[in-house]
C-alpha cells in the first residue's frame, strides 16, 4: 500500500522526508523506484531496524504506517514515533478502534503519545466503507431492521499483511484453524483473549 500512499502524499502537496521498510529488496532505493512513478525524490528507503536511530533527524510531522493489520504488530513502530514526538496514522484495521480488542496495549500506546504530545490513530478503508458510509446511509433511513454488508477487493493491491490475515494460500483445514476458529469462541473466552492481547478482531 505504501506505493499508493506515497503517491497520494505527493499529489496533495505533502513532502516525504523518510521511508522505512523490512523488505531487503527495497532498502537503499529511492522511493521513486518503489513507486515506479515520477522523478527522483532523493529519499532513500532505510531499514526499519534503523528507524529508532534516524527518525529524529528526518524532522517528520507525521508517519503513515502501511505495514500490518494487527495492533501488536505495530507496537514497535508506534512506540518509536511517539518517543520522537512524531504523530502517526495507520491503515492497520485494528487501530481504527482497538480499545475493545487489545485494551492493555492501546492504553500503553495512548500514554506514550500523550507523554510526547503527539497523536496515534487508525483510518482507511474500514473508516470510510465500514463506518462513515454506513452511518451516512443509516441517517437517511426512517427505520432500520438489520444491516448486512459484503466487502471484496483484490488482495494483490494490499500486500502480504492483508493476504495473511485473510488466510490467502491456506488449505481448508489450515484456514479453519488459523482464521475461522478465532471467532468461534464464547464471550468469556473472547474477553480473556482481549485482556491478554491475543484476540484477532472479527473484521479480519
Language model features with spans:
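Active-site-lining helix/loop region of Rossmann-like oxidoreductase modules
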Residues: 1-4, 137-204
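Residue-level detector of anion-binding/catalytic polar loops
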Residues: 15, 87, 119
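Rossmann-fold NAD(P)-binding glycine/threonine-rich loop
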Residues: 73-75, 79, 84, 92-118
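Short, ordered loop/turn segments at secondary-structure junctions
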Residues: 22, 68, 92-96, 125-126, ...
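N-terminal glycine-/serine-/threonine-rich beta1-alpha1-beta2 phosphate-ribose binding loop
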Residues: 1-84
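Short, hinge-like loop/turn segments at secondary-structure boundaries
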Residues: 33-38, 107-109, 138-140, 165-167
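Short alpha-helices
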Residues: 114-143
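General beta-strand structural signal in soluble alpha/beta enzymes
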Residues: 90-91, 120-123, 148-149
Amino acid at each position: 500500500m505504501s506505493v499508493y500512499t506515497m503517491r497520494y502524499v505527493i499529489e496533495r502537496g505533502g513532502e516525504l522526508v523518510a521511508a522505512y521498510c523490512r523488505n531487503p529488496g527495497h532498502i537503499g532505493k529511492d522511493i521513486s523506484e518503489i513507486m515506479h512513478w515520477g522523478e527522483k525524490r532523493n529519499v532513500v528507503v532505510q531499514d526499519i531496524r534503523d528507524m529508532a536511530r534516524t527518525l529524529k533527524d528526518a524532522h517528520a510531522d507525521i508517519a503513515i504506517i502501511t505495514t500490518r493489520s494487527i495492533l501488536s504488530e505495530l507496537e514497535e513502530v508506534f512506540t518509536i514515533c511517539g518517543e520522537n514526538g512524531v504523530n502517526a496514522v495507520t491503515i492497520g484495521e485494528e487501530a481504527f478502534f482497538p480499545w475493545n480488542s487489545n485494551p492493555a496495549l492501546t492504553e500503553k500506546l495512548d500514554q506514550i503519545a500523550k507523554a510526547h504530545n503527539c497523536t496515534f490513530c487508525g483510518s482507511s478503508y474500514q473508516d470510510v466503507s465500514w463506518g462513515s458510509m454506513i452511518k451516512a446511509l443509516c441517517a437517511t433511513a426512517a427505520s432500520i431492521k438489520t444491516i448486512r454488508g459484503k466487502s471484496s477487493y483484490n488482495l494483490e493491491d494490499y500486500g502480504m499483511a492483508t493476504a495473511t490475515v485473510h488466510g490467502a494460500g491456506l488449505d481448508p483445514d489450515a484456514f479453519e484453524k488459523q482464521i475461522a476458529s478465532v471467532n468461534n469462541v464464547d464471550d468469556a473466552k473472547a474477553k480473556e483473549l482481549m485482556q491478554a492481547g491475543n484476540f484477532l478482531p472479527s473484521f479480519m
